[in-house]
Amino acid sequence: MDDASKDYLESLPELHSGETFCFDCNPEVPCFNQCCAELTLPLTPYDVLRLRRHMDNIASETFLANFTTMRSFPDTGFPLPMLRMLQGPGEPCPFVTPAGCSVYENRPGACRFYPLGRGTKMGKHGIEERFFLVQEPHCHGFDKGTERTAEQWLHNEELSEYNAANDRYMRLMALVRATGKPLEPRMATMAVLCLFQLDKFRELISQMHIFAHVDVPAARQTSIMADSLDGDKAALDFALDWMELIIFGQSSQLSKK
């Protein structure tokens, strides 16, 4: 998360553990779909993984070229693909339709969180999180909403896998941030391939015989190379380990042979 995003979250009312809010979003709400336009929406590796699978496993190169604008985190140099809005009136999200989200089952984590914001930081005992309530002037979802806690909202929106994958990515970036130096361009390019282009990463694994150089159980190797949603999850998990290893020469989860 960049400084501007942190400042924005800090300006919002915090929703403490056990506190409730009332919100619903559906076609009956007058503002339905209005929040799905003119977005500044960064995509995480797990977001891209899920969206590509929804789109019949479209090639990663095609997905990134057609749907994103690639930027980078200034403090770490890690890639930061932004979902590209359509040109034209209102600049709508490329996945929104009059009936709602066309990728709803695999929509990005930020969309699932709304109207909550999640702030995280590395604490002594792991990831520490705080939740904030985003109340925009155009939104009528709060008018007659269902009462819930932040924890209930996360459960209903099936955010556990998103958070787990995104927190792993955040930990890797935190390690790089602690060095005070962003990734070199060559390593940043490798991060795009390994984290956002899992199809290309599998090709790299085969071409470079990576499994011959690191200690990966046979069952995990099979999972990583499987062309499936679960295989993609395993590949991303390994990619995060691999990036840590090649950046720092060691990894807490992966060792050289």
For each of these PLM feature ranges, what is it?
Residues M1-Q34, T40-L49, R53-H54, I58-E61, ...:
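Short loop/turn segments that flank or connect secondary-structure elements
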